Amino acid sequence: MSDRTNVYDEAQMGRNRVGYGKWPAVVVVDLQYGETDESHPMGSDLSDVIANTNDLVDIAHEKGAPVFWTRVVYTHPDAADAGLWTKKVPLIAEWKPGSRWVEIDDRCHVGNDDHILDKRHASSFHETELDSMLTSMGCDTVIVTGCSTSACVRSTVDDASAHGYRTIVPETCVGDRSDEQHEAHLWDLDRKFADVEPVDAVETYLRGL
């Protein structure tokens, strides 16, 4: 880690913070049973991630800030709408309408006015309405939570930054089936595309809206 840190420091990566904007949205990535139920081969224990995300979502609800929940769903009979992703991750072909694996975990505090977006690829922005909805709502900040840190969270953060949003990742509100990948990607995201923040700091920001 020290060698990597030195290289990034010399390149001035992560030197500055993007900071918080005036109006945020919380984007909760893929807390569906295919990811949160340990009986599924792709599932892992994300109890703490769900609990910490719920705390943020509850504050967002109180303040009237928009909350989006994304999930991976394939409508084509053989999951052709996944493209080549099923070549690398074949089990996601099971994630179809009516399957338990596409349902958002019941422990999540989904509000009546929240927005549920179905997606077919890793990023919550790719071929979804997310960007246009954020723009119409006047959002300049995206708070990304959910799973997995190394894949769908990562892709969502990358795209949020590319679309010009101040991108915040509460460090205990994201998770991964691999602790090693989780830590590595959080470290890298904080240096390149987002502010990885203590959840308390994000809660304080939301309460101040």
What are these regions (language model features)?
Residues M1-N112, L206-L209:
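Active-site acidic carboxylates
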Residues E62-A65, G138, G164:
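Glycine-centered short loops/turns at secondary-structure junctions
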Residues G98-G146:
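Internal catalytic-core helix/loop-beta-alpha segment
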Residues I143-G146, G164-D179:
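A short glycine-rich beta-strand->turn/loop micro-motif centered on a GG-aromatic cluster
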Residues T149-T156:
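Short glycine/serine/threonine-rich phosphate/pyrophosphate-binding segments
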Residues R177-D190:
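Active-site-proximal loop->helix
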Residues F193-L209:
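A charged, well-structured terminal subsegment
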